[in-house]
Amino acid sequence: MNVTPWEVEGVIDYSKLIEEFGMQPFSEVLPEIDNPHILMRRGAIFGHRDYWRIIEAMQKKEPWAVMSGFMPSGLPHFGHKMTMDEIVWHQSAGGKAFVAIADMEAHSVRGLSWEKTRELGMLYIKSIIALGLREDAVIYFQSKSSHVKDLAFELSAEVNFSELRAIYGFNSDTSLAKMFVTAIQAADILHPQLSDFGGPKPVVVPVGADQDPHMRLTRDLAARISIFSFEPVEGGVRVRSRKGAEYLSSLRDLEFDKKIYEEHMDIFGEAEEIERAVRKIEVEIGGFAFIPPSSTYHRFTTGLTGGKMSSSKPESYISLLDPPEEGAKKVMKAFTGGRATAEEQRRLGGEPDRCVVFELYSFHLIDSDEELNQIEAECREGRLLCGKCKKMAAELVKSFLKEHQEKMEAVDLSNYTIIG
């Protein structure tokens, strides 16, 4: 198993990923979520970091945001749809939505022209709008966002080559552009907390597990670039300054009981209120006061031939732009969890856990749990053979693609603000 931001190889063991990457199982927070998305209920979203911040903000009706992006290296497909659905759901749950088109990454890492990245990027934008993204979303191309590029420059001062080499495996042959893209992506994630967008707030980033190195680096950078750090102490919070003890003097007028030391200040009271007050002062004196971003991790969408669905492997995916009949044909050729013969399938039953078609049902095509459970039971009991199952899925894919593409055609971009 090899999982990096640019390559996924081998059989993925998600429980092992949770352990290796230091995530938390999403099942632990699922009971706290009102009306969870089917991707949450059905286990497509398997891990998280600090999603409790988002749940608390939802429950208290406090500001929060959802942010994710798409590298326009090929046509949008069902793997991208998973992230799009998560963004749309979080927006409907009260989050401010930020959608990045990672044209700088596509240009520097994949070698696409700026013209091609824009052409493809607009297809991603129309697709997520067709899936329900509302007009109040912030949509932008990385190369055209001064907020992102300026913040990336600031963040790049906080990281060096040795660290990038350890995280990403960069070497002397790695281009400077590819290295700088890591700062751009960190800025994508953190810029919803800039003052121009309402200041510090919880932000959740729905991603695949291959993007976790970006999240770990970004969480570290959020702490490094902020002036104040927080540590729990009995009855309150210990506040330190990363930029010099003189900054602590700006906290002297806070209306909490406190003890002032040479290198830190202990402030007593409810931790959340203290941290909010300190962050407010940090912004007032010119700091960033970033809250470490939260993240959710979804399973990789299995390609039609096995392995990860990838824009760089056209044979592996159903594009959201495929002609409906073509999409249906691809389903009929997809890898399934069936047995070698129909007789063996009737006797032993199918294996939906290994089936690309059942995955399409679970994560994209069937909303009804009762209907999905019936298909699974009939498959396992050998009563539903792969040929019939594929035909059912092919019709659903054809219907979805037809409706989705009609919605894309009807998208009125004049109702949206697109930076770029």
Curated annotation (Swiss-Prot):
Gene Ontology molecular-function annotations: ATP binding; tryptophan-tRNA ligase activity
Span(s) of short sequence motif 'KMSKS' region: 308-312
Gene3D superfamilies documented for this protein: HUPs (3.40.50.620), Tyrosyl-Transfer RNA Synthetase (1.10.240.10)
InterPro entries associated with the record: aa-tRNA-synth_Ic, Rossmann-like_a/b/a_fold, Trp-tRNA-ligase, Tryptophan-tRNA-ligase_arc
SUPFAM superfamilies membership: Nucleotidylyl transferase
Keyword terms, alphabetized: Aminoacyl-tRNA synthetase, ATP-binding, Cytoplasm, Ligase, Nucleotide-binding, Protein biosynthesis
GO annotation terms (biological process): tryptophanyl-tRNA aminoacylation
EC number from the UniProt entry: 6.1.1.2
Intervals of motif 'HIGH' region: 72-80
Single GO cellular component term: cytoplasm
Compartments where located: Cytoplasm
Catalytic activity: tRNA(Trp) + L-tryptophan + ATP = L-tryptophyl-tRNA(Trp) + AMP + diphosphate + H(+)
The organism's place on the tree of life at top rank: Archaea
Similarity remark: Belongs to the class-I aminoacyl-tRNA synthetase family.
HAMAP family reported for this sequence: Trp_tRNA_synth_A (MF_00140_A)
Protein name: Tryptophan--tRNA ligase
The organism of origin for this protein: Archaeoglobus fulgidus (strain ATCC 49558 / DSM 4304 / JCM 9628 / NBRC 100126 / VC-16)
Gene that encodes the chain: trpS
